[in-house]
Amino acid sequence: MPKIDVLLHGFPFRTDQGIPGFCSSLLITGEKKTLVDVGHVGRRLALQQALQERGLAYDDIDVTVMSHAHWDHSQNFDLFTKTPMLVHPWERKYAQHPHPNDWATPAWSGAMVEFQPDIVEVEEGYEIEPGVRIIHTPGHSPGSITVLVDTDDGVCAVTGDVLHYANVALTKTNPLVFWNERDAEKSISRILDEADVIYPGHDRSFRLVNGEIEYLEPMNLTFAGVHPDAPGVKFDTTPRPPWVMPGVEDQTVESLG
């Protein structure tokens, strides 16, 4: 059966100076090697190292998947120009003309998507290989897709930001909505109904056991260049309220063109 290997872990932390945006990059290995999300340029060398540690070069990847076109998940696809890139047609269209309030999809996003020479538009039910399939899970963005993988651990969902981090499985609320709030809630519920194990966009893999989060891997993160006791360094564990982009109510599938 296919297996999932975490190349880069996602992390949900922010700072008062901006968003690091470290997303998960997952390698699904079965009949093909499928890479889901590639991160931003700040993790370019880390992605290269993760592949090298597994004896892989960029051209060894058979398929890449763009869960959605936000900057933190998609800037390194140019490393894989010899590999087909799967993207939902709604996401591809939206990237050409993003909403002006959408800070996660800059105006250059469309050019970044179209830079790939082999774009494959995929919709609900597309099968990458037996046991690895695409479902359409909109809300966070119009064309967000999740990869469902049949593994020895059950059905695993590689979600991108349909489900940012583990706590979303409890709140059932997407913390960042750029497309449609109701769709986002429905997509979260669908993943929770269909998946045994979840690989979120910005957290470690987990499962729900009796309504509690059970992480499958320990936290492993090192901060360099700053001392925890340095004056002005603070840690804030206050939960962040969810954010819905102003203007989402004006967006429709027809408006994508």
Predicted regions and their residues:
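Active-site HxH/HxHxD metal-binding segment of metal-dependent hydrolases
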Residues: 39-116, 229-238
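Short, flexible loop segments at the rims of nucleotide/cofactor-binding pockets, characterized by
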Residues: 11-17, 40-43, 62-64, 134-137, ...
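Hydrophobic/aromatic beta-strand patches that form the interior of the parallel beta-sheet core
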Residues: 5-7, 65, 86, 120, ...
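Metallo-beta-lactamase
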Residues: 89-136, 142-217, 221, 227
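Zn-dependent metallo-beta-lactamase
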Residues: 1-31, 186, 192-194, 211-216, ...
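Active-site flanking residues adjacent to catalytic metal/cofactor-binding acidic residues
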Residues: 36, 67, 87-88, 158-161, ...
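Conserved beta-strand hairpin/beta-sheet module of binuclear metal-dependent hydrolase folds
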Residues: 2-53, 146-164
